[in-house]
Amino acid sequence: MTIAVFPGSFDPLTNGHVDLITRASRMFDQLIVTVGKNTSKQGLFTTSERVAFIEAAIAALPNVTVQVEQGLTVDFMKSVQATVLVRGIRNSTDFEYEQGIANLNRHLAPQVDTACLMADPQYQYVSSSLLKEVARFGGDLKQLVPSMVAKAMVARLEGDH
């Protein structure tokens, strides 16, 4: 049985994330989506809120679970016997960044392989900072994030401009 892990901060969860999770769920026996905190970014949603958004979005995917992760992803992977780390790639900048992380992870945990999935072209330009800016100024988020996330973003950022 192949267990894969798809880590991220998911702040906010995007339709691009949901697309990658759905595609990865078809490739592996079990997929664990891990929610972590990106210490270099100001958070919009709490960890609990992000977990709830993901769980709602993936409810129809029986082989996908969501867990909170603190620490090194490869250490978490060892603890659940996962052997594949799934990453989404939007552009060449993402690729170069992920290549460096994959090499480091391979050094720390030789049993871990990284599988990079190319983002669907309709989501290649989407980033969390861009989405927050769109929400702050009342832009339409319907095609970019799940509806529950769009509503929560508008409520959270209302009057923040």
Curated annotation (Swiss-Prot):
Cofactor: Mg(2+)
Compartments, record wording: Cytoplasm
UniProt catalytic activity: (R)-4'-phosphopantetheine + ATP + H(+) = 3'-dephospho-CoA + diphosphate
SUPFAM superfamilies: Nucleotidylyl transferase
A Pfam family recorded for this sequence: CTP_transf_like
InterPro entries from the UniProt entry: Cyt_trans-like, PPAT, Rossmann-like_a/b/a_fold
Residues binding ATP: 9-10, 17, 88-90, 98, 123-129
Protein's name in the database: Phosphopantetheine adenylyltransferase
Organism encoding this protein: Levilactobacillus brevis (strain ATCC 367 / BCRC 12310 / CIP 105137 / JCM 1170 / LMG 11437 / NCIMB 947 / NCTC 947) (Lactobacillus brevis)
